Amino acid sequence: MNSLNKKSIKDLDVNGKTIVLHLDLNVVVDYENKRILNDRKLRASLPTINYLINHNAKIVILSHLGRIKTLADKQSGKYSLEIIVDELRNRVSKNVNRVVFSPLNYGETVVQMVNDLEERDILILENTRYCDISDEGEYVGLEWDGSEILGQFWGMLGDIFIDDAYGVAHRQLSSNYQTAKFAKKSALGFLIVNEINHLDIALEVPKSPYLALIGGNRVADKIAAIEVLCERADQVIIGGGLVYTFLYAQGYNVGLNLVERNMIDDCNNILEKYGKKILICFDFLCNNDFSDTRPIYRKIDEGLEGLYGLDIGKRSLKFIKHEIYRSKTILLNGPFGVIENIKNYAQGTTEICKSMAKQTTRGAYTIICDIDTSSHAEYLGLDKYINFISTGGGASLSYIEEGVLDGLETIDNVPLNVLKKE
C-alpha cells in the first residue's frame, strides 16, 4: 500500500504478461566518449526489472534521455537510449533471455518487435523525447505535451503498464499519464512506491526535532515546498543560491548574486509568518567570478558588493551542524554552495552531508531529495549512510507541496473495499 492509493506491481499478476515499463533512465552520460558516468537511476530501476524477469514477463521499456531540442539532437544519436543496452544487460538478473534495442518507438515495426518477444525478453524503445521533434525539425511536443495518440499506442502495446519513472512523475507526459489512461491495467513499480513511502516518513510521521535544509537555486521552484516544511518541521534553514533573494528582501546587499525580484513579496511573507522557525544563512565564501580560486570571506552584514556568494561561511556551517546533531529527522533538498567542479565551494554541502551521515548512525532519519546533492553524497561515498536518497528532485518538491504527483493520476486506484479493510 502507498499513500497515493494506487495499485502497485505486486497487486497484479504479471507472470508471462507483456509489460510496458516506464522508467527514468536519464543517466549522466559523457556524450563525447559515449560512457555512462553515473548509473544510479538505472540501478534504482533494477528491483522492478528483475521482479518482472523472474516472473517470466515480456518487458517493453519506455524512457527519455537528455533534452531533445532540435532535429540535430535527434539525428546525431547523441541522446539515443542505445547507450543503455549493454549496461542494462550486464546488471539485470541472470535469468534474462535477451536485451534488445529498437531505434524506433512508434509504428508497425515496434508492434511487430513486441509481438516477437519471448518470456524474459527486454525491448528498449528509442528515447521517448524524440517524439517531441518532427522529422522536419519542428517542435511538436508529442511526449512532453502529453499526446493522447502516442499514449494510446504505448498503452496498447502490452497487457499491463507499470510506471516506475519517479523523476518525471510530477509531469503529465504521454509516457506516463496518457499511457496509463489507455492501458488495460496499470500499477506503480517498486521505485516509486519506495520514494513515496520514504517521503511520507519525513512529512507525515517525523521524529522531532525535525530539521529541513533547503538549498539550490530558484525560489520560485521551492517557495511552496518551503511553506509546507515550515508548517511541519521544527526548523527550516535556507541556503544555496535561493538565499540571496531572501536576504535581498530583508534589505541586504547581495552583490552579484541572482535576485528573483518577482519573489520578494513571497519571501517576506514567509519570513513574517514563520520567522521563528526559519534561519537564513548569514556568512559566505565569495569571489568575483566562478573560478576555483581562493575564497573571500564575507558576513552578510558587511555586504557582498562586487561578489558572488559561492558557498556558506564557517559560522553558518557551524550552526547547521549543531542543528543536525540535535535533530532526529533531517531532510535536505538542494546544495548549499557551488558543487560542480569547484572544490573550494563544495565544502559546505560536503560537511552537511557528512554530518547527516553521522547523525544517521545515531538513530536519526535522513533523506536527500534532489538530484545534485544526491549525486554529491554518492560521490563522497556517503549514500550508504543516508536513510534514503531520492532519484527525483522536481517530483519530490511537487509531492511535498501537493501530496500528489500529476503524472500518476491515471494509474489504477486500489479498490475502496481494499482500502477499508486496511
UniProtKB/Swiss-Prot annotation:
Biological process according to GO: gluconeogenesis; glycolytic process
Pathway: Carbohydrate degradation; glycolysis; pyruvate from D-glyceraldehyde 3-phosphate: step 2/5
Subcellular location: Cytoplasm
Gene Ontology terms: cellular component: cytosol
InterPro entries: Phosphoglycerate_kinase, Phosphoglycerate_kinase_N, Phosphoglycerate_kinase_sf
Keywords, ordered alphabetically: ATP-binding, Cytoplasm, Glycolysis, Kinase, Nucleotide-binding, Transferase
SUPFAM superfamilies documented for this protein: Phosphoglycerate kinase
Catalytic activity: (2R)-3-phosphoglycerate + ATP = (2R)-3-phospho-glyceroyl phosphate + ADP
GO terms of molecular function: ADP binding; ATP binding; phosphoglycerate kinase activity
Annotated family: Belongs to the phosphoglycerate kinase family.
Complex and partners: Monomer.
Protein name: Phosphoglycerate kinase
Organism, as annotated: Ureaplasma parvum serovar 3 (strain ATCC 700970)
Gene encoding the protein: pgk
